[in-house]
Structure formats: structure tokens, C-alpha cells
Amino acid sequence: MSLVSTVNDAERTDLLNSSGNRNGPVVETVTTTAVEEKPITTKSVRGFSVYHKGGGAQLSKEALYRAKVKYGIYQSPARSFSTGVAEPKVASDVAANLANDNKTTIEAYKRLFVDPNANTAARRSIVNGGPRVEDVVIPESHYGSHQAATRAYSVASVATDENARRLQSPQSPPATRAHSLKSANKAFYNTKLPEQVEVVPKQVGKKPMDMSKILSSAENRAQHRVTDRWDPVKADHGIRTSTQNLNRVRSTSLTGPIYKERKGVKEPSSKDASATQGDRGNYAQWAAFAVRDMDPTALTNKEFEERERAKRELLSQITSQQVLAKARENADKQLDAIDANDVHRVLFGNDAYNRAAIEIAQRNAQRQAGETDVNEGKINIGGGLWLSPDDVHTIAREMVDPVLGEVHQRADDQRATDVDIKERNDYVTNEWNAWTAMHQTKENNNEALLVNSQNKRTREADSARSEAEKSFTELCDRMDKQVAERNDLLNQTKQAREQLERETEEKLAQNKEDNKTALRDLKGQHAKELEEAREEQRRLVQPYEERLEEVNREHESLVQERTAINEEIARLHESIKEHQYQISKYEREIKSHEEQNASAEEELKKLETDREGIQSHYNDNVVVNANKAKEQALLSSEEARLQNLKVDAIINERKTELNRTEQELQREKLNMLEAMRKTAEARGDENIDEERVKQLIGMTSTEYVEEQKKLQKAAGKAEKPKASTADKGQALDKALAHDQGDQEANTKDFKEGAETKAKESKGKPSQSVAKAIATSPTKTEAKAEPSTSKGKSNGVGTHPDNASGISQISDTLENGKHLSEEDLKELAEDAEQRVSGEPQPSYFKEVF
């Protein structure tokens, strides 16, 4: 039986307020505190209907569950710690006994807080005094158990008393009367804690409670429970692990390689195995040591692991249906063979064999029935020992009687204890009734005191109200007189204010008329001054606007000029590409003529009669060189013109930027003058601040206007002789076209003259041709000639006529000397280098 509860107050209140705990038995207890001779009697109501359903009944399932939840006891194999008791259902009893022996634990169950209603109870106790109840002394031997039992009974008392108060006054707070009284008495009498006061135990009741046997029984059960937990009995319902079983396991195909390693180990005998199995005390310890000392790497053989790994790899590679079908067939055959070798199936499946066995068994049974049995009516207990039922009953009675005697003794003790508890409960009930009557009397006195106090306060309030009304009436009369005086003064003040308002309105109307007249005159004067200032401003701004328009026109002309220059540059780029293509073409022709010249020289050594044909080839080579020189001259001239145009474009861009800057400057000046004009208008001045303008611009506005007029006149005079860059570009294109026509004519005349002279000099030696090549114009000279002609066409010089060019070639051919082959080769190489060389700097100087 549980005598103590360790649940907190909130859980206990919720538990006892439930519907199942409202009908518990009522038990009254008396708790005495020896402090200043002021004992305290409390009412306790037991409501443990869940734990005890009747006299001598066992704990219910709900009570057992709550006890397990309370103490953390769960019947689960996963929990390895012990609860300290033999059976979970007696955990509450064991906990109560332990709490009785442990003084520190007892203090943990006591209420050490002050109830919220302690203040009210203390105030009431001051009037009526504390309760006068005879002290009840508790024996020292039963002081702990008495406190534990009282504590257990007080749990139900709280719930029952609280439910009763709820039924009487639903709006009252949840605090109980017992708690309030106890807290009030402690607060009023300055009660100390129980551990600080020495309690003198005295005998209570007729017979003291002897719990020695109960405690000894609980200790024995707890020891038995701990032993079962530390040394559990292993339940083995299968095959014993004996030598025969080891041999049977060793014979299997899978574990054979593992047990080969244990051939040298001595196998235990069946007797030793039985002894080992019988020693259950060291089972858990051996299992723990085995787990601690287990090496996972030494469980299996390395060769067996390799073989199993190879087997798994082989099985993973078998994916063919034929292989699987063959495997199934082999497995079926093996199963059939196993079924055929099953002795039990063959034995009990043979009908003839079974019939013969039944007949033999019947004959043996009939023969044994005819024989006399010596041990008839006895029980075979094994080992050839037969006992009669009387002997068995005698042995059982001798073994059970001591236990039953102890049980009967404990039952008698428990009954005596229950009787003692009942007597004590009756005594406490009587004491409680007396205390309740006394407390009722005290409450009646308190209520009477409250009624008297209320009547006294009512009389005092009536007298105070009459005094206040009298004072208020006097105050109202005095205030009415003051209000009348204030009203008279207010009327006089209103009359004075009306007179002042009339005078002020007349003055205000006169001031408005005067202000309107002055405002009209001022507006006319300001309009006239504003018109004059605007005229002056327009006169000052006019030069800036004209200058701005002029700069815009100049900017547009420069933009057009730049566009024309860009178009001319693009055209010259295309012309340069065309000339470069012609030069590469002529270079290819020169290479082909050089190859023909080399072959012609070889043929010239063999055939003297073909001199005329070879001479014509040399003449063609000269013409090609002349054309190449012409194209290079045109290319150089166009590159020079391109450079000039680029320079002009850069100059044009700079001029454009300068004009743009000038425009920004003119705009800023105009904005500045406009701002100064607006400032002057805002101030009401007729003219702008000339000193400020001179400080900012460097001159006055009048001087600035005169200077702008002079600049406009000078710009008009300069526009007449000025020619645009586009017209210059067109004149230059015409000059280049004229020069190109002159060069083509000179080339044609030169070619015809060379052919004529070649026919005339047919009979002369071939060395004259080499001399002509040596004396022919080089690349630099060929470039110089067209550049000179170009310069003359532009006013620098004139082109050489065709007659002079032909005479020059003919003189070269006629004056040619006989040269050796080595000299001819050197002259040819020199001519090639000159033709393929870069133009000389002097040529570019003449061009630029």
C-alpha cells in the first residue's frame, strides 16, 4: 500500500479533480506542530479510488501504470537498470518504506510555500485568536510513518475540499481552506520548519504499528528482484549446445572451413557443458567479456572470405536464362534426393509398415495388460523411483506449510494494523468534528464583527456626507457673488472693445485707400522701367545672338567640309588598293619576263639567228618596268594626297572643337548677361552692373557689343576669297587625272620608240641590250619623273615630251659596249635591285 506520493501539486490537483476520484473515502488526520504551544489540525480526505478499489484489493492497472510513470519503471528487455524491487506492482510500497527511512526525502514532500489567502486568514486569526486543540504526541518510532501517511491522506483532502467549495461558490479562487488556515497560522505564530523543531513523540492510539516484518519482507523481495536483474535466467527451448551439436554443425558444407582451424582444440565433454550451462550466475558477465574481447577481423577465415567473394562475383556474372534454368533443374534434383533420403517421410508414409506396427503394438499392450504391475497406482518421478500420491502430498505439505504460516502471520499482522488505523481514524474524526465546531463559532463571530464594522462605517459616512453638503452650499453662495461681479466687469470690457473695433475699422479703410493709390503709381513706374530694361537687354543680347548664328553657320560649313574630306579619303583608299593590285600584277609580269629572259639567253648562245626575238623580249621588259614605275609614282602621289587630307581633317576637327567651345562661351556669356538682367529687374535697377560685367568679361557690355560688330564685318570680308576644301579636292582630282593621261601617253610613245630602235639595232651584239637595261631608269628615277611632271603640272615644272624619252633610249642602245657574261649578270642584278628597291627620300621630298 502506497503511503507517499511524489507528484507535484499541479498534477495532484488535476488527478484528484477527475470524475473517478470524487467518491473516495474520507479520512481525518491531526498534525501537531510544537511551536509556541499552537497545534494545527488539518482535514484530509482520501481520494485514491484509482489505487484502492476495496478492502484488501490489489492495485489496479491504472495505478500500476501511474506508479511506473512516476518512478520511471518500464518492463522492457531494452532497459538494463534495476528498479530495486522484486515485482513492479509493489514499487509504491517499497518507495514509501524508503521514504520513511530517509529523513531528507521526507522533507522534500512537505509544503514550504505560503498560500495566497494567508493574509486574509492571518487577519481573521488576529481578531479571534488561534485554534485551541489538545496536542497529539506521536511516538518517535512511528513519527516518520505517521508523517508519510498524513501526507498521503492530505493529497485527497485538497481535492475534496476544493470540489465542495466550488459547488458552494463557483467564483471563488481555487485555494483550499485547509491550506489557507495552515498558512495563516504559520504566518501569525511565526511557525518554524519541522526540521528546526524538536518533536517530543508520544503514543497515539491503542496499539503501535509494528512494520519490522513488512520492512524485512520488502527488503527480501527487493534483494530477490535485484538478483534476478543482475543474474537473469536464460530461457532455452531449443537444442542444447553439446558436443553432438558441435559435430553436427561442423559437418555442414558452409561452416566446415571455419571449424577446421579448431582441430587442435579440446572439445568439452557433455558433463562440463552441462555444468557450464547450469552456472547461470556468470552468464551476463561472460557475455560482456566476450563482446569486449571480440575481434571482428578474426571471426572468419581469410581463405573462406576470398572463396565467398569469388562465389558472389561468379553469381553476379551469371545472367543467362539457360544457366538459370540449369540451376533450377539441379536444385529440383537435389530437393528430390533430400526427400528420398528423409527416413521419417518414408517410414510414416508406408501404409503396410504402419498396419504391421499397429498390430504388434496391440499384441504387446494386451500381453502387458495380462501381467501384474508392481508399481500400479504410483508416480514415476524418474531414475527408477516411484512414489504414491500420499507421499507426494506429504512432501508438498512439508514444503508449503512454512511459507503459508509466514503468510498467515503477515496477514494477521496486517489485519491488526488495519484495525489500529481504523481506531486512529475514528479518533481523528472526532477531533476533527470538535475542531470544525470551534472553527464555525469563530467564523460566526468574525461575520458579526464584520456586520458591526459595516454599520459603524455607514453612520460615519452619513455624518461626513451631511457636513460635506453644508460646506458645498456655502461655497456655492460665495461663488455666485463672485460670478455676478465678474459679469459686470465683462459687460464693461465688451463695450470698450466694440468702441475700439469701430475706430480701428475706420483707420483701416483710410489706409487701404491710400495704399491703393500709391500702388497704382508704383505699378506704372515699374512697368515703364521694366520696358526700358528689356529694351536695353535686347540691345545687349542682339550681338551675342548674331555671333551665335554666325558660329553655327561656320560649324555647319566645317561639318560639310569634313564629310567631303572623309569621302575623298575613302575614294583614295580604294584607288590605292587598285594601284597596289596593278603593281603586284606588274611584278608578276616582271618575274615571268625574267624567266623568259633567262631562257632567251641560253638560246642566244645556241642560236645567233634569233637575236631579233630576244631583243623584242628585252624591250617588253623595259616597258613593263616603265609601267611599274608609273604605278608606283601614282601610288606615292595618292599616298601623299591622303596624308594631306588627313592633316586637313585633323585641322578641321580642331576648328570644329574650337567653334564648339566658342559657341559654349557665347552661350555662357549670354546666360550670364540674362541672369544679370533678371537680377537688375528684380532689384528694380534700369541698367546692369557694368563693373561686374567688366570684371567677368574684361570689358563693359557696350565695348563687347562694338567688338562683336567688328568681328562680324571682318568675317564677312574673309568669306569672299575663301575657297572650300571640297573645291580644292575636285581641282586636285582633275590634276591627277591629267597627270595620269600624260603618263600613259609618254609610256606608249616610249614603247613605240623602243621597238623602232630595236629593229634598227638588229645586227648589233646582245651586250648593248644589257647596257640599255643598265642605263634604263631605275625605280627611283621612274618615280621622280612622274612626280616632277606632276609638280610641273601644278606649277612646278613640265612633263618631258615623247621625243626626248625615245632619243634617250635609242642613245642608250646605240652607245652600248660589248660586255662579258659576268658584267651582263651584274648589271641585271643591279637593275633588279633598283626596280624592287624602296623609293629614295629625295623623291618624297619632291612630292610633298
Curated annotation (Swiss-Prot):
The keyword Cell membrane applies. Its main location: cytoplasm. Keywords: Cell membrane, Membrane. GO terms for biological process: eisosome assembly. It is a peripheral membrane protein. Transmembrane segments: none annotated. Residues 221-239, 259-270, 712-722, 735-763, 814-835 have a biased composition (Basic and acidic residues). Pfam families: Eisosome1. Residues 240-255, 764-779, 786-796, 804-813 have a biased composition (Polar residues). This is Eisosome protein 1. It comes from Zygosaccharomyces rouxii (strain ATCC 2623 / CBS 732 / NBRC 1130 / NCYC 568 / NRRL Y-229). The gene is EIS1.
